[in-house]
């Protein structure tokens, strides 16, 4: 249990997808103008990561990795070269299901997210989590915890940035830094703040 808690905290704070690895920056910067939209996208990313990382773990360990098809009488087959294609396919399917659910039950959030909802499919933070899972050889349980933690970390970062950007609207920002300029500086300072967690031994 302690191991899983350590993995969760590490995924949220120490190895934050947005502020440590700078993954998913396209949607991170575009949707962080309002807290409501940022929260909606953050929740969507948490759900997608929590589902896709363990599903991709199952596919990798039962079909793709070398020797995984031993149960089918094919012990020397290595399909790991299909990993990238498989992970993207799983992510696309989950995002498509989520898009249909939001369109039907929460149309306001669906409209607020707009084109960025289907873009979660190619969000490198989503794909990056699955690739990290394979690289670190996580078990199914570890993948589930890591996927959830990575999603929560990314959501925490985008919601925090949205809150700061809403406050910045009322600040006297120099003309040359308005818009993305001050946002990049803000993200950099947030990243420096999150670096303090790297000194914690988990």
Curated annotation (Swiss-Prot):
A single BP term in Gene Ontology: respiratory electron transport chain
Transmembrane segments: 11-31, 35-55, 81-101, 114-134, 144-164, 180-200
Keyword Cell membrane carried by entry: yes
Catalytic reactions on record: a ubiquinone + n Na(+)(in) + NADH + H(+) = a ubiquinol + n Na(+)(out) + NAD(+)
Keyword presence, Cell membrane: yes
GO cellular component: Gram-negative-bacterium-type cell wall; plasma membrane
InterPro entries: NqrDE/RnfAE, NqrDE/RnfAE_oxidrdctase, NqrE
GO molecular function, one term: oxidoreductase activity, acting on NAD(P)H, quinone or similar compound as acceptor
Highest taxon listed in the record's lineage: Bacteria
NCBIfam families cross-referenced by the UniProt entry: nqrE
Purpose: NQR complex catalyzes the reduction of ubiquinone-1 to ubiquinol by two successive reactions, coupled with the transport of Na(+) ions from the cytoplasm to the periplasm. NqrA to NqrE are probably involved in the second step, the conversion of ubisemiquinone to ubiquinol.
Subunit structure: Composed of six subunits; NqrA, NqrB, NqrC, NqrD, NqrE and NqrF.
Family according to the record: Belongs to the NqrDE/RnfAE family.
Protein name: Na(+)-translocating NADH-quinone reductase subunit E
């Amino acid at each position: 249990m302690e191991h899983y808690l350590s993995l969760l905290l590490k995924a949220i704070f120490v190895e934050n997808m947005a502020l440590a690895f700078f993954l998913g920056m396209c949607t991170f910067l575009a949707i962080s103008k309002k807290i409501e939209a940022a929260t909606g996208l953050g929740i969507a990313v948490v759900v997608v990561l929590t589902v896709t990382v363990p599903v991709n773990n199952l596919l990798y360990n039962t079909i793709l990795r070398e020797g995984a098809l031993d149960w089918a009488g094919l012990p020397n087959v290595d399909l790991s070269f299909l990993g990238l294609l498989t992970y993207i396919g799983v992510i696309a399917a989950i995002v498509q299901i989520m898009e249909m659910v939001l369109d039907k039950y929460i149309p306001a959030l669906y409209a607020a997210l707009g084109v960025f909802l289907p873009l979660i499919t190619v969000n490198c933070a989503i794909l990056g989590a699955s690739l990290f899972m394979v690289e670190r050889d996580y078990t199914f349980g570890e993948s589930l915890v890591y996927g959830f933690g990575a999603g929560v970390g990314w959501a925490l970062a985008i919601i925090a940035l949205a809150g700061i950007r809403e406050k910045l609207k009322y600040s006297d920002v120099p003309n040359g830094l308005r818009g993305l300029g001050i946002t990049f500086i803000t993200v950099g300072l947030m990243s420096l703040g999150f670096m303090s967690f790297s000194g914690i031994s988990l």
